[in-house]
């Protein structure tokens, strides 16, 4: 299984803990997808106080993330979302923490900050498009080939642009 690090991909994962959010639950939601992710001291908010943390880790393995998108069979969605902002061998995307706390992968396609927050992921590396296609490959692509930004890509609102 491709993990990004062994293939020369720079992986940066970050999230924000704010307001009355529980740092423990936020960390759990991130670690459900990225088990190597670490955070500093976890101080639960008390009534009348709020949290404001920005957590960021670099060189995080994508192995568990890749296993999850394969198991949950959302490889084409993953390819399209991860490829939407691909420019000059760099891309970024967001995962919904509300889904990750339940050990599911769901991508944030909205520009705002949804209920439960997001996990920000940035990938940088030579031939990143090829790596994304390899990491999300499945047998169905033998019959219906797909590539980043092909005519079958989904629109920015998540709707399919064509049906087969």
Model regions and ranges:
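Short, charge-patterned binding micro-sites
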Residues: 40-63
């Amino acid at each position: 299984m491709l993990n990004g690090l062994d293939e020369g991909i720079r992986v940066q994962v970050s999230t924000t803990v704010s307001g009355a959010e529980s740092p423990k639950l936020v960390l759990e939601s991130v670690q459900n997808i990225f088990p190597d992710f670490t955070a500093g001291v976890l101080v639960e908010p008390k009534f009348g106080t709020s949290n404001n943390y920005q957590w960021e880790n670099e060189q995080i393995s994508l192995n568990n993330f890749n296993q999850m998108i394969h198991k949950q069979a959302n490889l084409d969605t993953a390819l399209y979302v991860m490829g939407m902002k691909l420019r000059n061998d760099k891309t970024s995307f967001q995962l919904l923490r509300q889904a990750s706390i339940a050990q599911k992968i769901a991508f944030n396609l909205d520009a705002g900050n949804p209920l439960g927050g997001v996990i920000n992921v940035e990938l940088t590396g030579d031939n990143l498009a090829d790596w994304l296609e390899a990491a999300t490959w499945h047998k169905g692509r033998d019959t219906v080939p797909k590539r980043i930004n092909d005519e079958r890509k989904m629109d920015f609102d998540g709707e399919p642009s064509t049906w087969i």
